[in-house]
Amino acid sequence: MLKLIIPTIMLLPLTWFSKKRMIWINTTTHSLIISTIPLLFFNQINNNLFSCSLPFSSDPLTTPLLMLTAWLLPLTIMASQRHLSNEPLSRKKLYLSMLISLQISLIMTFSATELIMFYIFFETTLIPTLAIITRWGNQPERLNAGTYFLFYTLVGSLPLLIALIYTHNTLGSLNILLLTLTTQELSNTWANNLMWLAYTMAFMVKMPLYGLHLWLPKAHVEAPIAGSMVLAAVLLKLGGYGMMRLTLILNPLTKHMAYPFLMLSLWGMIMTSSICLRQTDLKSLIAYPSVSHMALVVTAILIQTPWSFTGAIILMIAHGLTSSLLSCLANSNYERTHSRIMILSQGLQTLLPLMAFWWLLASLANLALPPTINLLGELSVLVTSFSWSNTTLLLTGFNMLITALYSLYMFTTTQWGSLTHHINSMKPSFTRENTLMFLHLSPILLLSLNPDIITGFTS
């Protein structure tokens, strides 16, 4: 694991010692090279000695998320260049340092073998994210968004710390492998039920589950482009990863406790999708589907079958790339029109035809059209939820219909129609932006050729 962690840490001195003209080139090229390192972890059988140590290790569940995290850093750096063009050099370097330190803490969170270490790095991701939102956001409401983000996450994760301390006192170890192999089955008592809630609540806030999701639209809307990309693509996946790791340890208690949360996630999925149909703010319309898609992931994880786990992992990777792509497209609109209101940026297809092509592909990926990897994830979750209960097909099917409606609504509102009067002149789409969209879309399409590499430890 050090062959991924050390090069990422070395990006920090590279950033601070780079000259003004070379800072973007250096950080982008080096982070792109680093993003290829997790490819070595996909061959788990032969290379297991190289990707496993006492504090850090990778397995088929961790590796796709590590790959997503590493792949996203060069994309966030590329997307932020216009946003930071008027900032002094020291602030550019500080911004890049925040992104790199966030990547380091995410890599360590995903690869930690001790649960207390996992908790520490899980909380560490808050600090750079909060700094990015509150310092580099565009509107004054960013401070309110930062407060929501901080308090929801901290209050949700405090019971997790108490549960971890209790587990360590009773069992004497918090090693994930040891707990998976040695723990006895938990009986269905009040104390154990409370412990299950304490373990999972932090991750349900992070996912977020419907009802605990109020921080996400605020943080997503007020964050700068890199903050929105990382928040949607990777930070929400921390919740899914934590739930998948810990619900295996907490079996068979999960089967008893899952029903209310399954119902809440299925209901929340419909509600948040319906909210999207009434949105006028483009970034808000991109933020709310994250709650809807993550509700599907919560459903898949709580059903606790190998196929549902596979669907959850695929859906997390697919949603990470798609949501990040939509955030980039919304940012490209915002940089030209200086407004997030969709009606004020309508008719852009006539001015930016290539960008309209990216918008079409992103919208189709969002509604899980073949040959995207999103389709495979949604189908896996759909089939497993149907085998768990037939009535879920009505809810999930209705959700897919609403998803198609708001995806096409987003595309038609921003691209079609007559141009508004305040748009007199507009810069064309840059090569940097087109490259950024291509680097988002190519994994979504290419993974559908060989989805085995991200199906997790169930394959």
Curated annotation (Swiss-Prot):
Task: List, alphabetically, the Pfam families matched.
Answer: Oxidored_q5_N (PF01059), Proton_antipo_M (PF00361)
- This protein is called NADH-ubiquinone oxidoreductase chain 4
Q: What is its EC number?
A: 7.1.1.2
Q: What is one GO biological process annotated to this record?
A: electron transport coupled proton transport
NCBIfam families registered for this protein in UniProt = NDH_I_M
Instruction: List the record's Gene Ontology CC terms alphabetically.
Output: mitochondrial inner membrane; respiratory chain complex I
Origin organism of this chain?
Pan troglodytes
Query: Domain of life here?
Result: Eukaryota
Which protein family is named in the record?
Belongs to the complex I subunit 4 family.
**Could you tell me the gene encoding this protein?**
MT-ND4
Location in or out of the cell: Mitochondrion inner membrane
Q: What class of enzyme is it?
A: translocase
Annotated catalysed reactions: a ubiquinone + NADH + 5 H(+)(in) = a ubiquinol + NAD(+) + 4 H(+)(out)
Instruction: Give the Gene Ontology MF terms in alphabetical order.
Output: NADH dehydrogenase (ubiquinone) activity; ubiquinone binding
